């Protein structure tokens, strides 16, 4: 193209405010510059914090995000996977769910890069990004025990299957064994999910049947707030009558009264890293590699006291 012609074309582009058509561009380079993230629920603080990290990393590379909420249902998940295939997304983040074999097979047949974030994978070839749930829960239980609590209840959401499969339950139980403390029936309560209402129901069960509890460890901050609500309904003060500890360190943990002592997992950073792994893979910088384990820390606030 001659210099004069090129200059005229660029001038016309500027005057008409022309923008390249994203669909047409994707047809040429076989990329849509779109990532998808699949959650069981999008109305909680966990999903919002993770999504913020994913979106920031994607936006910096000119990618957009499609968010899918499955409700944890098999049929809805498969429907979304079919939809994402039709939309030709460049990568998928499977968040806070179990990656069943049929999901993994479907995605891999389409050759769509995939990572699992804060969930379980049935396929060891799929990279996972998560905290060491067993160690985190062990540390939390040991922390409460070190403060003199010997009768500690636990509430956890059952998204990952049986208690034996759930790392947070294993860590809680191991801490009790290592400190010579026996767990009694009903001391660990399995709930359907990790929401506030699940914490309320689980808290009511614990406090009605195990009246000698001095602390409750909940496997999410929203569960912990539900426990605090259940305690308040029974006339119990937190932490004077009952200490409550959560997991995640969502923004609401420091907004509640009293502010919640919790286990912090770096959710924003986990989301950002998950997106970055996919983006680096797509750009040929590095292949999807090994699993990534993130550290956790205990954030001490005012919902736990020494016995």
Show the residue positions of the predicted features:
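Central regulatory/effector-binding core of bacterial HTH transcription factors
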Residues: 56-104
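N-terminal helix-turn-helix DNA-binding module of bacterial transcription factors
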Residues: 1-33, 305-307
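Short gly/ser/thr-rich secondary-structure transition/capping motifs
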Residues: 15-21, 75, 95-97, 200, ...
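Short histidine/acidic/glycine/proline-rich micro-motifs that form metal-
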Residues: 41-44, 71-72, 157-163
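Short hydrophobic/charged patches on amphipathic alpha-helices used for structural packing
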Residues: 24, 78-81, 104, 141, ...
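N-terminal winged-helix
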Residues: 39-56
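Bacterial carbohydrate/catabolite-sensing allosteric modules
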Residues: 15, 56-61, 85, 109-116, ...
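Interdomain hinge and pocket-entrance segments immediately C-terminal to HTH DNA-binding domains
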Residues: 20, 29-43, 61-63
């Amino acid at each position: 193209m001659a210099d004069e012609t090129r200059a005229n074309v660029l001038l016309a582009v500027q005057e008409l405010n022309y923008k390249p058509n994203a669909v047409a561009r994707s047809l040429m380079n076989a990329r849509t510059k779109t990532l998808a993230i699949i959650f069981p629920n999008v109305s909680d603080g966990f999903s919002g914090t993770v999504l913020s990290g994913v979106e920031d990393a994607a936006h910096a590379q000119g990618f957009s995000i499609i968010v899918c909420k499955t409700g944890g249902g098999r049929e809805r998940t498969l429907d979304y996977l079919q939809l994402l295939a039709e939309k030709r997304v460049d990568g998928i983040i499977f968040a806070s769910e179990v990656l069943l074999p049929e999901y993994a097979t479907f995605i891999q047949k389409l050759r769509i890069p995939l990572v699992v974030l804060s969930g379980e994978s049935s396929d060891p070839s799929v990279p996972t990004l998560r905290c060491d749930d067993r160690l985190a829960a062990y540390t939390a239980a040991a922390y409460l025990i070190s403060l003199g609590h010997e009768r500690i209840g636990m509430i956890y959401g059952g998204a990952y299957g049986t208690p034996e499969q759930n790392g947070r339950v294993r860590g809680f139980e191991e801490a009790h064994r290592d400190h010579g403390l026996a767990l009694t029936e009903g001391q660990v309560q399995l709930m359907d999910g990790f929401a506030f209402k699940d914490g309320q129901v689980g808290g009511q069960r614990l406090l009605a049947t195990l009246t000698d509890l001095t602390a409750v460890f909940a496997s999410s901050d929203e569960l912990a707030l539900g426990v605090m609500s259940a305690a308040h309904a029974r006339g119990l003060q937190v932490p004077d009558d009952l200490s409550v500890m959560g997991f995640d360190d969502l923004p609401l943990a420091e907004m509640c009264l009293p502010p919640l002592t919790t286990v912090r997992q770096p959710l924003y950073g986990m989301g950002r890293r998950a997106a970055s792994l996919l983006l680096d893979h797509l750009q040929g910088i590095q292949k999807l590699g090994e699993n990534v384990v993130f550290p956790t820390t205990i954030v001490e606030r005012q919902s736990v006291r020494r016995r």
